[in-house]
Amino acid sequence: MLKEHPEMAEAPQQQLGIPVVKLEKELPWGRGREDPSPETFRLRFRQFRYQEAAGPQEALRELQELCRRWLRPELHTKEQILELLVLEQFLTILPREFYAWIREHGPESGKALAAMVEDLTERALEAKAVPCHRQGEQEETALCRGAWEPGIQLGPVEVKPEWGMPPGEGVQGPDPGTEEQLSQDPGDETRAFQEQALPVLQAGPGLPAVNPRDQEMAAGFFTAGSQGLGPFKDMALAFPEEEWRHVTPAQIDCFGEYVEPQDCRVSPGGGSKEKEAKPPQEDLKGALVALTSERFGEASLQGPGLGRVCEQEPGGPAGSAPGLPPPQHGAIPLPDEVKTHSSFWKPFQCPECGKGFSRSSNLVRHQRTHEEKSYGCVECGKGFTLREYLMKHQRTHLGKRPYVCSECWKTFSQRHHLEVHQRSHTGEKPYKCGDCWKSFSRRQHLQVHRRTHTGEKPYTCECGKSFSRNANLAVHRRAHTGEKPYGCQVCGKRFSKGERLVRHQRIHTGEKPYHCPACGRSFNQRSILNRHQKTQHRQEPLVQ
């Protein structure tokens, strides 16, 4: 049977005066309900899946359209688009505890964002988290003098957790509709998770309603789950059974995992009923943990008995994290500046210099700097403590200079050398002397300058003469060895100092840069000009 063509079917209807309504198919990412916000298109661009398109060409067109609506090249320059992409990646790699501060303060540029993160890091390193005393002990600390109160405001958090639900309400696990939604594909699962989790934050029994700004932040964390913000098991949150009685089923879906009672220390009288509420996606757990840890802290922003750190019982199952403090019978709210994250906890200290590290591998890598230089260059024999230092040095022999200055197009083999060179264009001199307030573009120049105030001369020759700079000592030693490394390419005459070669070359070039202000005569050396002024123009001041 022949099928009628759509255009042929529409013609009689139009002739009869019947209005024809064309229904456009809604795109997979919901363009029918288009939101003009660039953030919406960014999320759609990051979450777009190949299965949502009819084919590779359609998928490519959809990605191009989403990217264009996100970055808006018709409104932004290339530099602005580049900065936007760099900022997005920088925010992705930042620790989770910075998210609330960034969203609250809203830095205007990448430099302002980096300065804010650096300031928060320094403040967090200065603050120390003091654990509360165990139950039964009488000693107290400065931060443990007051009892925990649910109404205390913690940092920038406006939501105040209240753990006052009746103990009779138990957790029955997720409803069948939740399980059916979680069994769908990853994209539908993410959307279903957001639809269930966001109402929990809006009007949950344990949490008051939050403002729209916090809801937007929550949505950003939920949709960022696929980027791997960290698994739930890596966090120091452990909910005993007695605390799960006070959590709603929707909140269990959010937290995503039930902790066995035997894995943690619980108060006497706790039941042993096991609750099964484990959504399969680890990224959804990590997304919510990123939100809750940022909003309420990780291990210290809890009510009485909530979030106790797991500890292996004698003869119990292995797997407890080494180095964690013993379980406490209370947790205290910390100041705003304190962020209990592993990036601020540095338990591994170098026995040589006392520098702290958050990972043992970083400590081992640092300790190599105190050992012998085991990596040697086959070209010049220079030794290095780390392999990456040797690889950077080998660029000087291979002629690789990948870093280019955008102002003068000068190339460098290392990024640090380029950054120092760019200060000559910007005039930046970040290193200042505390005695005379003179500024320098390099730290080494400041160190050499400060020796003029202290009188320090650490470089000593065999003859007993001392110098404040190593370069001056090297030039002085040539007087003993007779070395003359600087040679004239015209006449072959050699010199021990570079400035003497420069003065000599003026004889061949005829250059006379020193002029007498009285008579206008020119000379190729400053000493000759001074002698001329003494004999011919005694009244005139000498040229310095």
Swiss-Prot record:
InterPro entries: KRAB (IPR001909), KRAB_dom_sf (IPR036051), SCAN_dom (IPR003309), SCAN_sf (IPR038269), Znf_C2H2_sf (IPR036236), Znf_C2H2_type (IPR013087)
MF-aspect GO terms: DNA-binding transcription factor activity, RNA polymerase II-specific; RNA polymerase II cis-regulatory region sequence-specific DNA binding; zinc ion binding
Record cross-link Glycyl lysine isopeptide (Lys-Gly) (interchain with G-Cter in SUMO2), residues: K3, K22, K128, K278, K285
Zn finger region (C2H2-type): 348-370, 375-397, 403-425, 431-453, 459-480, 486-508, 514-536
PANTHER family documented for this protein: C2H2-TYPE DOMAIN-CONTAINING PROTEIN (PTHR23226:SF379), ZINC FINGER AND SCAN DOMAIN-CONTAINING (PTHR23226)
Protein family according to the UniProt entry: Belongs to the krueppel C2H2-type zinc-finger protein family.
Name recorded for this polypeptide: Zinc finger and SCAN domain-containing protein 25
Organism listed in the record: Homo sapiens
Lineage: Eukaryota, Metazoa, Chordata, Craniata, Vertebrata
Gene name as annotated: ZSCAN25
